[in-house]
Amino acid sequence: MTWDVDATLAQIRRLADAGCEIVRVAVPDDKSADALADIVKGSPLPVVADIHFTWKLGLKAIAAGVHKVRINPGNIGGESRVREIVAAARDRGIPIRVGANAGSLPKEIIAKYGVHDPAGIVEAALIPIRILEKEGFEDIVVSMKASDVGLAVASYRLAARRIPYPLHIGITEAGSAKRGSIKSAVGLGMLLEEGIGDTMRVSLTADPVEEIEAAYMILSAVGLRQRGPEVISCPSCGRCDIDLIGLATTVEERVRALGTKIPLKIAVMGCEVNGPGEARDADVGIAGGLHEGLIFKKGEILRKVKEATIVDDLMVEVEKVLRDKEAEAAAAAAAKPGTGA
């Protein structure tokens, strides 16, 4: 619960450690709103207040010092209420996120468009946007979420053509960790490849830290951002003479335990066919064999090792590469103007 300041801040710190850059907290009641000032003060991340139904909670959240407020045009109330939130946000110099959701569209939108029309979702967002613009307020972020991937993608594509404000993208109510990650990867991956999206969230019914991990995996997969090492591995087949599944899992765990944020590609391959050749772009990797394996670096074989020590031998090379990359990063930082001694 948001009103539990200690628990909320503990979760925010975990998210920050995982790489989260903005955090949104639900503000369902006055007790939660009253806790916001302490949460904002103790949070290492910008705090966004998520407001539904009770517009006065938005005013309390803004007064508490939140960095952004999110309102839902489907349930926040009439134009006069939106105007009051705008006035408070302008006084504080914070943006407003307009969040249209396919599951809570205004009645007049449903009557005109139904519930599965991207035009209806975009129009639901445009209604409060026009009110904000009429008040001369343009510090706006827009989202239009749906749990249906196709509907969400089509809505964001239409919004990108019609709305001149930053877009926060996501697939809402995506599901459990596995299903939700797949749905989010499909939908957000398409949008990101098209250059659509300024901020993003992967919504999962899971530990929220898993949302951050999934988001970085999606960003890495489309070549936008990479945070920390990436372990790639091939599917097992009849050529594989090693416990590839167990090997890949162990390597993932060992690499995660390093806690490094340095980008690094590590390959775990089942045989010489998929080894140094197909994974030649990996910084370092292993290719399994019968009771043995090959350690390779950028496609070049370094040495043959025993199966019993293959993970330890790989990690030795991983740590060498990390040290080299750390030294390169330090040298590059020192060479920048104003950073030298």
Regions from the PLM with identified roles:
Residues 22-29, 46-53, 69-77, 121, ...:
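Catalytic beta/alpha-barrel core
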Residues 30-51, 84-96, 156-167, 251-256:
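Alpha-helix-loop-beta-strand connector modules within alpha/beta enzyme cores
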Residues 45, 56-97:
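Hydrophobic or amphipathic alpha-helical targeting/insertion segments
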